[in-house]
């Protein structure tokens, strides 16, 4: 689910958030991005 993306997805310092984005999409969100090195899913 969406909350597990925050724990599972590593966010690199410089904007690489492919893992986060993928995880959020699987959880049913449109996209994910990184805020302060944490994965956030966009509804």
Curated annotation (Swiss-Prot):
Disulfide bonds join 5-23, 11-34, 20-39, 24-41. Its main location: secreted. One of its GO terms (cellular component) is extracellular region. SUPFAM superfamilies: Scorpion toxin-like. It is found in: Secreted. Expressed by the venom gland. GO terms for molecular function: potassium channel inhibitor activity; toxin activity. Reversibly blocks Kv11/ERG potassium channels. This is Potassium channel toxin gamma-KTx 4.7. It comes from Centruroides limpidus.
């Amino acid at each position: 689910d969406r909350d597990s993306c925050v724990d599972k997805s590593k966010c690199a310092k410089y904007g690489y958030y492919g893992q986060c984005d993928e995880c959020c999409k699987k959880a049913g969100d449109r996209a994910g991005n990184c805020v302060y090195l944490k994965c956030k899913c966009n509804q």
